[in-house]
């Protein structure tokens, strides 16, 4: 990633996705549970950021990763490293994202909920002397008329319900 960052001229960011539904993860060969995956992500980001910053060789001995004299010959072009984006609002996700990410990605939920999340995330980031940026993602449903848009919305909701129900 640091090499790509140098090649494309400081336009790279990395969005960290820890995973989704356990069944989907197992399909990809990842049999860790939800909270374990976030502990692994925390370790991975700790190691990756230290390699990118490249202050010299370091050792790391964690639950999931162990490195000795880790170092890269290539540092990130961006300082201190490639910007990290992160998403996830579970109890396991919030501390990891607040500790490591530069921009926290949230969905455009009711504004009160977004405000509560941002307050909590800011408090968590402050524990690490960090300030977060935010990306708020909205998914507009557009149609020729308001009634047609609501019809599309109901169809999307029914599709989600059908996909998420046990078969």
Residue ranges and their predicted role:
Residues 1-167:
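Active-site-adjacent structural elements that line small-molecule/cofactor binding pockets in enzymes
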């Amino acid at each position: 990633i640091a090499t790509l960052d140098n090649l494309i001229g400081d336009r790279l960011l990395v969005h960290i996705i820890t995973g989704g539904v356990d069944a989907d993860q197992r399909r990809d060969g990842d049999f860790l549970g939800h909270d374990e995956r976030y502990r692994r992500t925390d370790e991975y980001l700790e190691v990756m950021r230290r390699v990118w910053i490249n202050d010299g060789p370091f050792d790391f001995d964690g639950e999931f990763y162990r490195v000795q004299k880790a170092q890269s010959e290539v540092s990130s072009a961006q300082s201190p490293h490639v910007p990290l984006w992160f998403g996830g609002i579970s109890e396991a996700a919030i501390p990891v994202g607040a500790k490591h990410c530069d921009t926290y990605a949230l969905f455009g939920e009711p504004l009160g909920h977004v405000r509560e999340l941002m307050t909590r995330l800011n408090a968590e980031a402050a524990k690490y002397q960090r300030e977060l940026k935010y990306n708020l993602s909205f998914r507009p449903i557009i149609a020729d008329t308001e009634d047609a848009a609501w019809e599309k919305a109901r169809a999307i909701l029914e599709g989600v319900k059908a996909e998420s129900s046990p078969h």
